Amino acid sequence: MAIGVIATLLLFYTPVEREEPSQGGSSFGEAVKLLVPHKGTGALVLLSFIGIMCHVGIDVGTNTTAPKLLIERLVMSLNDAAFATSLYFIFRTVGSFTGSFFLRIMSNRLFFTLSVVMMLLAMIGMAVGESKAVLYTSIALVGYGNSNIFPLIFSQALLSEKDRQNEVSGLMIMGLFGGTVFPMLMGFASDAVGQVGAVLVMAVGVIYLFSYISKIKTSN
């Protein structure tokens, strides 16, 4: 307890530089205007917004599709297939913890590229895999690959509009609604052609992330 009190006192008397807030607030309309391509940063905010949608859509989509894939391809029981969700989150957590280490030894762009390649391999595996090993490996790959996409895209968007970071942050969080759009499209696709249709919808998101690679700055 004494250590906690001392730490609190030290923090209280430690000077902290605070960024002066911009004069006046921004309306919702002004924030949304940042999605319109403009001189300087071009369409980076819009591209980042779509990238966040794809990231969240793949995240939510994998959670809902992976167990169904195992049931459809391997005729598993629902209880056994539920392990797919746990496997995804295990590798997503591992990816989050190890991502900071890898970003110290490689560029942002290289790490982003490797992450997206993992996700593409995962989509191929989930689309054509017929064995437990292939499907489990694919689920693990998409979990690890998708674990650091959000912070990398988020940081690029913030760096593109340094004087409007609050507005950009809000827009990127709005991109989370991709978690509702993708499952809806995946549902339509799976009803039409089975779970491979849902995987193909997620693959479209992965392909979009490939197009975003050139927008990632190489510096850490």
Q: What would you call each of these model-derived segments?
A:
Residues 1, 185-206:
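A membrane-interface helix-boundary motif in multi-pass transporters
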Residues 1-24, 210-217:
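C-terminal membrane-cytosol helix-exit motif in multi-pass small-molecule transporters
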Residues 38-86, 93-96:
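Extracytoplasmic gate region of multi-pass secondary transporters
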Residues 160-195:
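A late C-terminal transmembrane helix in Major Facilitator Superfamily
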